[in-house]
Amino acid sequence: MIKELAWDSAFFKRKIGTLTKVPSDDALQKLLRKAHKDNYLYLTSRVSLKSVSEIQILEKNGFYLTDIGVVWEKQPDADFRPAISVTEASIKDAAMLKKISKGLFKDGRFYNDPFFSYDEAEKLYQAWIDSSFSDREIAIFHVAKKGFITCKKLSRSRGDIPLIGVAARDQGKGIGSNLLYKALEWFRMAGMKTVTVRTQANNVTAMNFYKGLGFSVKYVDATMGKMLKEEIR
């Protein structure tokens, strides 16, 4: 089944969908024909890296690799306390956070997928910051002009960190670890039992960062993309 990603479609001004699961080869070909008729211009699918057969079916039907992600997990059970001032951000801080975020997430799939332009990828992260302020399940913390972290409640017991970023000039100074301490403290106070964060497999610095702070790998996934071209309708 193909599900439209309404927010993505509106932001990129092209109809974008996702495969809710990878079907058989024949079923996928039928879905792709229907997607053409329904005016989709791009489809995405995220699958476990263990599912080699599913990845092969996607590749056979024109999907290409855009991202390999590593999902890390930790229980926020310790009494984490940041050693520097980390405060909750308000909408008034949006412009500052956007400035910090520029160019920080180039390992992300939107920068490496030919369907999206560099400018679109940059603007996407800016838009995510704006939308985070309007989401009641998200809290944002920052170290003024240096870094920020977003914390999202997925359920009563599970939390996730969608974004964490530190300005290039301030990296290596403990800003990131203190932002993470604040996030874990917030999740613990909110009753979360587990916290996840996803990073790209090629971002070795980030992976060593999470490992050093006690996170462990939960699973690895692959994000595949497919452009639906006019000439094959």
Label for each model-derived stretch:
Residues T20-K92, A222-K226:
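Acyl-donor-binding surface of acyltransferase catalytic domains
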